[in-house]
Amino acid sequence: MRLRGAVLSAACAGMIFCLWFVFVLSRRGQVVEAAALEGSKIGAHYVAGHARTLLSVVSMPAAGVLVAIILIIGLLRRSHRRAAWAVVAVVGANLSTQALKYWILWRPDYDITARMDNANTLPSGHTTMATSAAVALILLSGRRWRALSAWAGALFAIAMGYSTLACQWHRPSDVIAALLVPVAWGALAVAGGAWDSASYGGAPPAAEEDGAERDEDHPDADEAEGPEGPKRPESPEGAGGDSTASTEEADRALHRAPTTSPAILSLRTQRIGNALLTLLGAGSMLVATVLGIWVWTRADELVARRVLFASYATGAAAVVGVGCLAMAALVSLTDWGAARHERLP
């Protein structure tokens, strides 16, 4: 799990710089994104009002308050390690966005946009804050709630990102990069041990895991295990019964229980939910890829209305795709296999 977290974090960081290289440093990339901004004005009266409302209601301070509430809930549930790593992820993501935007990345002036300063706007600060809240929610969730948290977080982050695009606040690459920055930090938190728990047969969980994490990830642990390990069903024949038959019956009962446990079924449901989120993201990325190739090969025809709208649709589809895939990838770092070793009554 830790290695996969480090790999996902590095992959997100690499994709951010790829976005910058393709859509900011290259002239054609800037032309395509300028077309996407122009295309967002087509039919804007249908969505711009709702987008502005969302951006005004869920402002940067409001998003910060939301993150604080999520972290406080985590502390109240005694998920201290997860809450600490969530703080690291949120603070690191937002500081990284500001550093990337103002100090590390730059935007060559190809005389394409009307902005006099032609300032770099990658990544989007609003989308970073919204995605940070989503990542904090996922990090603080137990295994049985992470897929649901990913769906909620993806919807929130995508809505914020799309709103900045619809209102011409940001270009598509700005939004996509802002979706990746917090996920990179979330994956780094997992690599650092945010979701670690004692493995089956190893040392007992840390003190903080006796609270919320033990209740969610190891339900009924106190009933299933005693001082000497997992309880075995009592022999129906009493102390004088056949000890061999009793032992075999107990072993069969212990191996049958996990397959019918509601907790295990819940975990399976979460895996299915995460798979559906992945499929939605993959489908959106397929649409974005097909449209993007078509638009990229028509960079000289970007004054045509259909090409302008296709550029905008490409960016919107890519925002949905990356938002879903990034959240699903973070949840996929969960050690689902650990649940198979949980002996529940």
Where would I find each of the regions flagged by the language model?
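Exposed boundary/loop context
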Residues: 22, 118, 154, 219, ...
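Membrane-embedded catalytic cores of phosphoryl/pyrophosphoryl-handling enzymes
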Residues: 114-210, 246-302, 308-312
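Residue-identity detector for glycine
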Residues: 5, 14, 29, 39, ...
